[in-house]
Structure formats: C-alpha cells, structure tokens
Amino acid sequence: MSSKRAKTKTTKKRPQRATSNVFAMFDQSQIQEFKEAFNMIDQNRDGFIDKEDLHDMLASMGKNPTDEYLDAMMNEAPGPINFTMFLTMFGEKLNGTDPEDVIRNAFACFDEEAIGTIQEDYLRELLTTMGDRFTDEEVDELYREAPIDKKGNFNYIEFTRILKHGAKDKDD
C-alpha cells in the first residue's frame, strides 16, 4: 500500500484545524484588517507566523525581544500559526470570556471591605441599574447556582472560579 505523503513530511508539526465558524465571528472589514496585520507580521511571506517573523516585526518597532519572550508568544498557539489560527486566537481573545483575574477584579471594585464577597441585595441593585442592565429574572437565574452564604453574601471569588472551571461536585 503506497502513501501519497512522504513519511519525512509527517515529522513537521501540523496546524490544528481551527473551528470552521471562526470567519463568522467577524465582519468582512475586520477580517481584512486582521489579514493586513497577519501579512505585516509574516515577514518572510510563507503563510505562517514563526518565531523569526515575530522577532523581525518587534525589531522593526525598536524592540529587542528575548528568546523566552518570543517562545512564550509562540506557545500561545497549539501549532503553527497560519491565518485561520491567527484569526481564531484573536477571536478567542476578543470574543471569548475574560480571564479569571479580570472578572474577579471587576467584582472587587464593589467589595469595599476587600473580603471576597458582595452583599447580594447590593449586587442585585448594581446589576439592574448599571451598565448592561440585568432584569430581575436574569439576576434570579444568576443567584440560583451562585455561592451565597446564609447572611446573603455573594462570594465572587468562588463564583469566578465556577464560571471558569465549573461547579465543585456536591460530594466534596
């Protein structure tokens, strides 16, 4: 049985397939802007962003990045960075959930005693009167699974952990 691919080519790390709906996350003008940015970073024009491309791009901006810094940037991707992977990574950053510390710090702004909790009535008032206002029904839904103690303290540190990692088992 002959293989169409040479075995020597299989040692190269192949890009992981990005979700097919990645292009649906952005409108056409945004995709064009990302393509222009990708092309500016892809200094050697091989269709992939590699460590050397990042180094050259940063050097052209007057930066002198260390190998460790460049490695950390490259390790953000699960494989070689083609345009689809580049778009997927930005989509996750722009449209995905916020990092855990960002969510926690947003709650902490309203925790005057810095103890990791917010009084449930106060939080309800904030959620229904500020920013993108929640309805009472939406707050009720939020509170259904929220970590609220018997005194009515909403534990936002635990809530943030639940948002990012899921609820603990009841057996714990």
UniProtKB/Swiss-Prot annotation:
Phosphoserine sites (modified residues): 20
Binding site for Ca(2+): 42, 44, 46, 53
Xref: Gene3D superfamilies: EF-hand
List of residues that carry Phosphothreonine: 19
Location of the region described as Disordered in the Swiss-Prot/TrEMBL record: 1-20
Highest taxon in the source lineage: Eukaryota
Signal peptide: none
InterPro entries: EF-hand-dom_pair, EF_Hand_1_Ca_BS, EF_hand_dom, Myosin_RLC
Domain EF-hand per the UniProt entry, residue ranges: 29-64, 98-133, 134-169
Molecular function via GO: calcium ion binding; myosin heavy chain binding
UniProt biased composition (Basic residues): 1-16
Keywords noted in UniProt: Calcium, Metal-binding, Motor protein, Muscle protein, Myosin, Phosphoprotein, Repeat
GO CC term, one of those recorded: myosin II complex
Function summary: Myosin regulatory subunit that plays an important role in regulation of both smooth muscle and nonmuscle cell contractile activity via its phosphorylation. Implicated in cytokinesis, receptor capping, and cell locomotion.
Subunit structure: Myosin is a hexamer of 2 heavy chains and 4 light chains.
Miscellaneous comment as given in the Swiss-Prot or TrEMBL entry: This chain binds calcium.
Protein name: Myosin regulatory light chain RLC-A
The organism of origin for this protein: Rattus norvegicus (Rat)
Underlying gene: Rlc-a
